[in-house]
Amino acid sequence: MHSNLPGYWLVYSIRVLAIECIRLAPEYLPFEEGWRMQQELHKKITESQTNKNRQASMIFCEHEPVYTAGARTRSWEMPQNEKVIRVGRGGKITWHGPGQLVGYPILSLGATPDVLRYVRQIEEGLINALQSVGINGFRIAGRSGVWVRNGVSDEKVAAIGVRVQKNVTLHGFALNCSNDLAPFEKIVPCGISDAGVTTISRILKRTITPKEILDSVFNSICSALEYINTCRGNV
């Protein structure tokens, strides 16, 4: 089975007949193109739910700079004179751009989706990936995503925003690796005003790019979701 999606891709597959695409620097992915890819994979996986073998796919990318606003974002929370795309995921406004690893797992949660459990699994995978580079990430009750401790305050290093449609997931997570934090100063990230954001590189005081941590993230996410992963394609 071949993908007709354009660009420079590394193709991963997990579980049965899964196709995953990666576009990292310098081939940044426009958010709109990534959304079309999600919709295409969502349609295929939704149709496969009635088959014996279910598909499960993940897109990895670094986006071109963009703000995305979740369903709960209010108009006054939008940054001025900036491109903002309204999306159907949960949560509020955030930023995506170069240096940030974005992952979109597209998979079936079965006939009775447990969305909270799914989010916790994604968090677990990201926490384990951070441990692989010596960072202790953790959850905060009532707040999605992955956090780290900075002195007396907590900072978010990974954001999660998902949507489940016809029992199949859309959207996903964003892990701050080596991205500039200045764009976050124009918004209240994820609607949380009493905590900051950080990056892996800032924590470790050395540059860690999305490409460098991708394998660890992929393996940890697959393990947390109880999927078997295989890899094929051009690196």
From Swiss-Prot:
InterPro entries: aa-tRNA-synth_II/BPL/LPL, BPL_LPL_catalytic, Octanoyltransferase, Octanoyltransferase_CS. Residues 52-229 form the BPL/LPL catalytic domain. It is found in: Cytoplasm. The record marks K156 as: Lowers pKa of active site Cys. Pathway: Protein modification; protein lipoylation via endogenous pathway; protein N(6)-(lipoyl)lysine from octanoyl-[acyl-carrier-protein]: step 1/2. Disulfide bonds: none annotated. It holds the Pfam family LplA-B_cat. GO terms for cellular component: cytoplasm. It is an enzyme of class 2 (transferase). Its EC number is 2.3.1.181. Belongs to the LipB family. PANTHER family: LIPOYLTRANSFERASE 2, MITOCHONDRIAL-RELATED (PTHR10993:SF7), OCTANOYLTRANSFERASE (PTHR10993). Catalyzes the transfer of endogenously produced octanoic acid from octanoyl-acyl-carrier-protein onto the lipoyl domains of lipoate-dependent enzymes. Lipoyl-ACP can also act as a substrate although octanoyl-ACP is likely to be the physiological substrate. In the reaction, the free carboxyl group of octanoic acid is attached via an amide linkage to the epsilon-amino group of a specific lysine residue of lipoyl domains of lipoate-dependent enzymes. This is Octanoyltransferase.
